[in-house]
Amino acid sequence: MANELPTNVSYGTVTGRYLLAYADSSDVGLNPDGIAAGGEILFTPLVERLRDATSTPPVTIIPKQVACTINVDGYLCGPDGLSSVRLLATDDADLDVVGWLWQVTYLLTDVEGSLIRGIPTHTMSLPGGTTVDLITIAPVAGLVG
């Protein structure tokens, strides 16, 4: 049985959508087709433990890696299946470490299930009570050529 974390712990929400651009198929339109990527995105906390001395009773929180999938429409889905994921906030003043980061690793696949490159691993902060769209914070790809 899962226990709730203390009520003074803050969270943020992460969203994102990932489509692969393929040549136009035999559909009605003439434009390239957008097909949902597959695979997963991993969120790894870059902190070993967080002490919440202000909760009753005090508690040590050990953040764990969170694996999210990409649904059939290309949206990031948390372990609960919803089109977003709630993670521990990195700026919670009730915890003894403020300003830690999440590492974001993209393991996206194409329609054949092969890993695709394109979005490098990066870090992110997640302020409490906010929604962060990964599309707006992922590193911009350089030109190839």
Predicted features along the sequence, with ranges:
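Extracellular beta-sheet/turn segments enriched in Thr/Pro/Gly and aliphatic residues
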Residues: 2-4, 124-145
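Beta-strand-dominated extracellular/periplasmic modules and repeats
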Residues: 2-122
